[in-house]
A protein has these predicted regions:
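Glycine- and small/polar-enriched repetitive beta-structure motifs of secreted/surface proteins
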Residues: 1-172
């Protein structure tokens, strides 16, 4: 542990904490927290948090958060968040968010959001959003949105939208 309050309370074996308050409370075995407040509260085994406030509050086992505020609050087992505020709040198990604001708020189990603001607000279980603002708001379970603003707002469950602005608003 290196830095003020880094690895302060209950740091597991072979855990690494570098930065002010990094991994400061309940950092599990083999986990890594680098950056101010990275992995600060309850970091699971083999979890990785790199960046200011990355994986800050409740990061699950094998979860990865890289970037400013990535995986900030409640990142579940095996979830991956890469980019500014990617997977920021409530990222489900095995969910993946890559890109600026991708999967920012409530990403379901096994969902994938890749691209600027893709799957940003409420992405359902096993949903896929690829492209800038694809599946941006309220993407249903098992849905697919590929392309710029594809299924941007309110895509229903088990729906598919492929192409620029395909199924842009309220796809059933």
């Amino acid at each position: 542990a290196l830095g003020y309050a880094a690895g302060q309370t209950s740091q597991g074996n072979n855990a690494v904490a570098i930065g002010r308050s990094a991994g400061s409370q309940s950092q599990s075995t083999l986990s890594v927290a680098i950056g101010m407040q990275a992995g600060q509260l309850t970091q699971g085994q083999t979890a990785v948090a790199v960046g200011y406030r990355a994986g800050e509050d409740t990061q699950g086992e094998n979860a990865t958060a890289v970037g400013f505020g990535a995986g900030l609050t409640t990142q579940a087992l095996g979830a991956t968040a890469l980019g500014y505020k990617a997977g920021q709040t409530s990222q489900g198990q095995q969910a993946t968010a890559v890109g600026y604001l991708a999967g920012t708020n409530t990403q379901g189990l096994g969902s994938t959001a890749i691209g600027f603001s893709s799957g940003q607000v409420t992405q359902g279980t096993n949903a896929v959003a690829l492209g800038r603002e694809a599946g941006h708001t309220s993407q249903g379970n098992n849905s697919v949105a590929i392309g710029y603003q594809a299924a941007e707002d309110n895509q229903g469950g088990s729906s598919v939208a492929i192409g620029i602005r395909a199924g842009e608003t309220s796809q059933g």
